[in-house]
Amino acid sequence: MPHSQISPAEGSRRILEEYHIDEDVGFALPHPLEELPDTYRPWILVARNLPKLIENGKLREEVEKLPTLRTEELRGHRLQRLAHLALGYITMAYVWNRGDDDIRKVLPRNLAVPYCELSEKLGLPPILSYADCVLANWKKKDPNGPMTYENMDILFSFPGGDCDKGFFLVSLMVEIAASPAIKAIPTVSSAVEHQDPKALEKALCSIAASLEKAKEIFKRMRDFVDPDTFFHVLRIYLSGWKGNPKLPEGLLYEGVWDTPKKFSGGSAGQSSIFQSLDVLLGIKHDVGEGSAAEFLQEMREYMPPAHRNFLSSLESAPPVREFVILRRNEDLKEAYNECVNGLVSLRMFHLSIVDTYIVKPSKQKPMGGHKSEEPSNTENRGTGGTDVMNFLRSVKDTTKKALLSWP
């Protein structure tokens, strides 16, 4: 990160502006739009009616009737993000439909061409990612009201009642709760650069406090998301076509590529904030083919480019961990370890969430039907295509190893 002689407050302002990080909602898109220009009204109408169209067996017919639209009229980042979100929802619904074995391997030209055009403009993949369904998929019911679950809603929905509302909004609120940590980063960098252990200790304590708040909000997932509905309904619509035996070759985007392409579904690994803190604290995950580090690096391609650039800038920042080790200051070590323990605690809780929402339901019969005939190793994969329990254990264990101690 650039570290000239500027105040932490000015440094924070510059970072927020340069890397598209909002003062209030962090990496989330501030004030997402809800409407597209009239030309694109057909997309919005389909995206807003997905559950009903799927239930009536009309979804694919309606998608195939959509006009082939170009994207030139979609000017401005927030307008493009709304269109990308809508097309992402439609794409997932078209591919998975009722969530059974009736899967489409080809995305029709009238959807694939504009979707890929928008994806190229935004620097995002043509699949519903975390940047879409969590970071850009929200609104306040009362615009002047608070940023609380009760005053918020999502813009589009899949089948499964309010399951996706709970899943996406709690994930968003975790992001927002943890976002003050980003504001502390300029102070962290400045403190290391200027050899100021007291300033660094204070900044690290503020990061630890934001992680504690994020975990408390994460616990609300159990209040709003039903495990059976998540596993047997919502999880299917969030699944990608990489590492997925249902689409082993990937998805063909008609009119764009001549061969199928593989993309991962939305994953918490695509969250910029927790990868940012790993980099800031010098936490190194296991490397090698199929490793946690490889997966997390790949997930950066699913982040908005400005957020990817922010992560890259952190990698060239003054090394916090090395500074703490060299100072041998007990208070500084404790503040650093509080941050690491905050990440460990969040990742341990994430493991318990995965056990509740993926592992246990995979061993039970669904609400109104037979248990899936997919093998359990498939059922236990996350929407990003990983063996989610092994991945999270690896990330949690390597985070824990970053704790500092000395005689």
Swiss-Prot record:
InterPro entries found in the cross-reference section: Indolamine_dOase, Trp/Indoleamine_2_3_dOase-like
Q: Does the keyword Oxidoreductase apply?
A: yes
> What coarse category fits the chief subcellular location reported for this protein?
cytoplasm
Q: Which UniProt keywords apply?
A: Cytoplasm, Dioxygenase, Heme, Immunity, Iron, Metal-binding, Oxidoreductase, Tryptophan catabolism
- Record-linked Pfam families: IDO
Where is it located? Cytoplasm, Cytosol
| Molecular-function GO terms, alphabetical | amino acid binding; heme binding; indoleamine 2,3-dioxygenase activity; metal ion binding; oxygen binding; tryptophan 2,3-dioxygenase activity
Annotated GO biological process = 'de novo' NAD biosynthetic process from L-tryptophan; inflammatory response; kynurenic acid biosynthetic process; L-tryptophan catabolic process to kynurenine; multicellular organismal response to stress; negative regulation of activated T cell proliferation; negative regulation of interleukin-10 production; negative regulation of T cell apoptotic process
Task: Identify the Gene3D superfamilies for this entry.
Answer: 1.20.58.480
Instruction: Please list where the region (Disordered) is annotated.
Output: 362-388
Q: Does the keyword Amino-acid biosynthesis apply?
A: no
Name the chemical reaction catalysed here.
D-tryptophan + O2 = N-formyl-D-kynurenine; L-tryptophan + O2 = N-formyl-L-kynurenine
Please report what switches on or represses expression of this protein: By IFNG/IFN-gamma in most cells.
Enzyme class, spelled out: oxidoreductase
What the entry lists under SUPFAM superfamilies is as follows: Indolic compounds 2,3-dioxygenase-like
GO terms for CC?
cytoplasm; cytosol; smooth muscle contractile fiber; stereocilium bundle
Please indicate which superkingdom the organism of origin belongs to: Eukaryota
Q: Which residues bind heme b?
A: H350
Indicate how activity is controlled.
Activity is inhibited by and MTH-trp (methylthiohydantoin-DL-tryptophan), modestly inhibited by L-1MT (1-methyl-L-tryptophan) but not D-1MT (1-methyl-D-tryptophan).
- PANTHER family the record matches: INDOLEAMINE 2,3-DIOXYGENASE, INDOLEAMINE 2,3-DIOXYGENASE 1
**Additional free-text comment from the UniProt record:** Ido1 and Ido2 are 2 distinct enzymes which catalyze the same reaction. Ido2 affinity for tryptophan is much lower than that of Ido1. Ido2 may play a role as a negative regulator of Ido1 by competing for heme-binding with Ido1. Low efficiency Ido2 enzymes have been conserved throughout vertebrate evolution, whereas higher efficiency Ido1 enzymes are dispensable in many lower vertebrate lineages. Ido1 may have arisen by gene duplication of a more ancient proto-IDO gene before the divergence of marsupial and eutherian (placental) mammals.
Q: What does this protein do?
A: Catalyzes the first and rate limiting step of the catabolism of the essential amino acid tryptophan along the kynurenine pathway. Involved in the peripheral immune tolerance, contributing to maintain homeostasis by preventing autoimmunity or immunopathology that would result from uncontrolled and overreacting immune responses. Tryptophan shortage inhibits T lymphocytes division and accumulation of tryptophan catabolites induces T-cell apoptosis and differentiation of regulatory T-cells. Acts as a suppressor of anti-tumor immunity.
Q: Which family is it part of?
A: Belongs to the indoleamine 2,3-dioxygenase family.
Q: How does it assemble?
A: Monomer.
Q: What is this protein called?
A: Indoleamine 2,3-dioxygenase 1
Q: Organism source for this protein?
A: Rattus norvegicus (Rat)
Its organism's taxonomic lineage begins at: Eukaryota, Metazoa, Chordata, Craniata, Vertebrata
